[in-house]
Amino acid sequence: MSDEKAELVSHEVAFKGYFQVGRYVFRHTLHKGGMSDVVSREVFERGQAGGVLMYDPGRDEVVLIRQFRAGAYAAGRHPWTWEIVAGIIEEKETAEIMIRRETVEEAGLSVGELIPIQNVMLTPGACSESCQIFLGRIDSSKAGGVFGLAEEHEDILVKVLPFAEAYALVERNEIDNAVGVIALQWLALHRDEVRKRWR
């Protein structure tokens, strides 16, 4: 809305390690009119990301990956998670270029046509990261194995699943990361249309 405005008072880096935390001081308009007091918030900053649900329309199969996740471990959840291939968009790189790089690194696959699904904020109350989600056409007959970059300590299992089986994982809450859930739910809504397009 045009009357919703924010004013940055100051910004500093509060922590810099594997990731970065910024401290933002700002004011913003209020729904009942006027401006808020000056507010200070720490924001987790890790750059912008992209992810791709790899799909073989002929076989009606998706390719998912499974790896250990420190965030899930710290939250007391099962730390090996089913996910779609994803990564951080590097400087001077588009989301599409990153997706093509990551599918090779994480799954040993080359992805064909990409269909944009959604560009979402993951946790806008505390993190600046957004994720551009795509559907990517692949040949699932060539998928499977363990991949990842040793220098990044990646140990990534690549698994081919019939779409119905993958979606059942969502319904049983066995896929509990938002990007994977969004991608699979989108495909559930648009699968017939995608299979016609990619005949």
Model-found features: residue ranges?
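Catalytic-loop region of hydrolases
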Residues: 1-14, 23
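Conserved hydrophobic/aromatic beta-strand scaffold that supports enzyme active sites
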Residues: 21-23, 64, 133-135, 158-160
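Conserved Nudix-box catalytic region and its N-terminal flanking loop in Nudix hydrolases
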Residues: 41-44, 61-101, 143, 147-152, ...
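A mid-sequence, solvent-exposed acidic-amphipathic segment
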Residues: 104, 110-122, 127
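Nudix hydrolase/Nudix homology domain
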Residues: 5-6, 10, 66, 77-82, ...
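Acidic, metal-coordinating catalytic segment for phosphate/diphosphate chemistry
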Residues: 14-59, 73
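Active-site-adjacent beta-strand/loop module that shapes the phosphate/pyrophosphate-binding cleft
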Residues: 26-31, 123-144
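Acidic pyrophosphate-coordinating catalytic loop
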Residues: 12-17, 33, 73-75, 120-132
